[in-house]
C-alpha cells in the first residue's frame, strides 16, 4: 500500500499556514451552515409531457435550491397540469437568497470530526415502494473485501458497459492510507409508515417535506433488534451516526420531485425531532437512494461515500450559483461532482486537503 510519505507535500511555511486557515474555516462552517447534500446530476433527462411529447431537461443545484433547464438553457417549471414550461430565470443573487432561506441551513456539531469506527445502515421501504436489491448485495457493496460490478445499460439509445472494483469500506481504507476501516452493520429493509411522497415531496420552497421523519421512523422500527448503545463509540449520549438507504430513486439524479434528495443533517439538534433508543439520542444522520435513475440498476458507492464524508465532518466543495464562475474540482473531488464518476461506481479518492483535514496526512514544511 502507498505510504503517506509518498504523498507528502513540500510547501513553504506561508502555504502551510494558509492551509491551516482554510481547514479552520471549514471546521467552523460545520457549526453554522446547511445540511450537506450531493449535487444534482448534470446529464440530460428525457421527460415525457402529459400529451406524450418529450423534452430534454437538465437539473442544477442541490437539496437547498434546484431548478431545471432545457436544451437552450432556459429555466423550466412544472405547472399544476403536469407540463414543464419555460419560466423566468433567477439571478445569482436570487439563487443564493433561496439557498439561505432553506429550512435545512442550520446544522449543529459539537466537534468537527466524527471518525466513528462502527455505524448502522438501515434499508428502508415505503408503503408504495420497496427494495429490489437484496440486503446481501447492499452489504457487499458497503463492506465486501473483493466487491466488483459488471453490467451494461442503455441510455438515450446508446449502450454503456460499466465495470468497477471496491466496496465503500475499501474506499475509506484507501483514502485514509489504511487508518480508517469502518464497520458498517446493514439491517432491513424495514417499512416506514407512509408513501415516499409523504417524506420526499417538495414544499413551496422546493425542499423535501419530511425526510427526517423517515429517519426517526426507521430507527424506531429497528430498535427491538438493534442495540443502539454500541454505536455511541465516544459515549457522549448520542449515536455517532445513522445512515439510511431508501428504496427507489433519489431526486438528485432525476428521480422526481416526490423523491428524497440524498443529504446529511441533524435529526435532534437541527430538525428538532427527538428519537431516543437504548438510552441514546439519534442526531447526525445521512441518507441516499437505492436505485440509479439513469442506469436503472442500484446505485454505486459514489453517493454513499459523498454523504458518509459529511458524517465524518467534511463539507461540500461544489459550486452552487449555477453560473459557472466559481471553479471547483468537479469530477476530481468526492465532495463535488465526483460521486457520479463511472455512473457512481468509481468515485475519486480523497485529495491531500481532505486527508489533512481528517488527520490522515501531514504536509512536510520546507524550512
Where are these regions (language model features)?
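Short, Lys/Arg-enriched N-terminal segments with co-localized hydrophobic residues
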Residues: 4-16
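Zymogen propeptides/activation segments of proteases
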Residues: 12-13, 22, 36-283
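Sec-dependent signal peptide hydrophobic core
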Residues: 20-27
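Hydrophobic alpha-helical context, especially transmembrane and signal-peptide helices
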Residues: 28, 43, 227-228, 327, ...
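Extracellular hydrolytic enzyme modules, especially secreted metalloproteases
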Residues: 241-243, 247-367
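Short stretches within intrinsically disordered, low-complexity N-terminal or propeptide regions
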Residues: 5-8, 28, 37
